Amino acid sequence: MTARGTPSRFLASVLHNGLGRYVQQLQRLSFSVSRDGASSRGAREFVEREVIDFARRNPGVVIYVNSRPCCVPRVVAEYLNGAVREESIHCKSVEEISTLVQKLADQSGLDVIRIRKPFHTDNPSIQGQWHPFTNKPTTFRGLRPREVQDPAPAQDTGLRLSAVAPQILLPGWPDPPDLPTVDPISSSLTSAPAPMLSAVSCLPIVPALTTVCSA
């Protein structure tokens, strides 16, 4: 079966467990052992020596021990979400049973299936995953990639735009300095006066503004 056909889920905890206070999901452990069966020797030793210490480390877990004639000893784990896990402890030592019980106590009760990604967020950011260059300037030393390769055309463009822009002079204002312009024929920089509007065209506007203000 392919990966798309197998069940999978995103990495998530039960009801955001651990965000505020951690609640252990294991609710109950039930041991079924035999009093005199050879296959239940390790389970009997675990109940006699280790079960009290496990109960002290996990005060929220209820432990039941059922001593009855059985061929295969087992432990049944019940979780808060209703999941039930049954594990066989047939002919296992005390150390193996302790490791198995601790694994059951650390689980959340969810199905052990394939995790799609090792990280997951319910509210993804438009910036994506954080990396060392997050919120850093995207240009190298303040220059765009085209300016880094050939800065001369960018300067020529700025000079050309400043030379073409018209300037309006009002009466009594000082004359602006001459700006270098680009000759379209020879493609060389020449010193020429910037184009400006005549001051005579502004004279009819000034009395009109004065009349409105005086009225």
UniProtKB/Swiss-Prot annotation:
Pfam families: L51_S25_CI-B8 (PF05047). It comes from Homo sapiens (Human). The keyword Mitochondrion applies. Signal peptide: none annotated. This is Large ribosomal subunit protein mL43. SUPFAM superfamilies: Thioredoxin-like. The gene is MRPL43. GO terms for molecular function: RNA binding; structural constituent of ribosome. Its main location: mitochondrion. The keyword DNA-binding does not apply.
